[in-house]
């Protein structure tokens, strides 16, 4: 019953997109099942609507926020921390060529926006995930 409603909703979105000369990209379309612990009762195969098909994913990205199956935000924090430390590693290659104040300004301008983006979805995270984000702030300072 519920799966047929989801399929009908996706079909309606695809029809609307077609009528507005837009195309649903099969390669970029993903979905997750947001349910209780009874996930084993959900279909694990993809759904097909016309030529469109999608399979359930363990993590999806929407507006730059990574949402995982259990809504724990672990994947979002992991990717954010990884991206920030990668930026810091790149900045360290020029550390000796620029004055300290310029380096600090660059680090602040290039790293902290990653932490600030969508930080309201991070409210109420476990302490372990907050510590990982704080380690980025400490490394940037």
Q: What would you call each of these model-derived segments?
A:
Residues 1-141:
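Hydrophobic/basic alpha-helical segments
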């Amino acid at each position: 019953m519920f799966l047929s409603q989801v399929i009908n909703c996706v079909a309606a979105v695809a029809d609307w997109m077609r009528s507005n000369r837009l195309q649903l990209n099969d390669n970029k379309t993903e979905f997750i099942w947001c349910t209780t612990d009874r996930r084993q009762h959900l279909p694990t195969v993809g759904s097909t609507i016309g030529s469109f098909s999608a399979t359930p994913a363990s993590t999806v990205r929407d507006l730059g926020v990574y949402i995982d199956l259990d809504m724990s935000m672990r994947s979002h924090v992991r990717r954010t921390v990884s991206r920030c430390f990668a930026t810091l590693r790149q900045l360290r290659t020029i550390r000796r060529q620029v004055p300290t104040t310029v380096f600090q300004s660059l680090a602040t301008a290039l790293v902290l926006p990653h932490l600030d983006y969508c930080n309201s979805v991070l409210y109420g995270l476990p302490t372990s995930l907050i510590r990982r984000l704080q380690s980025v702030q400490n490394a940037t300072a």
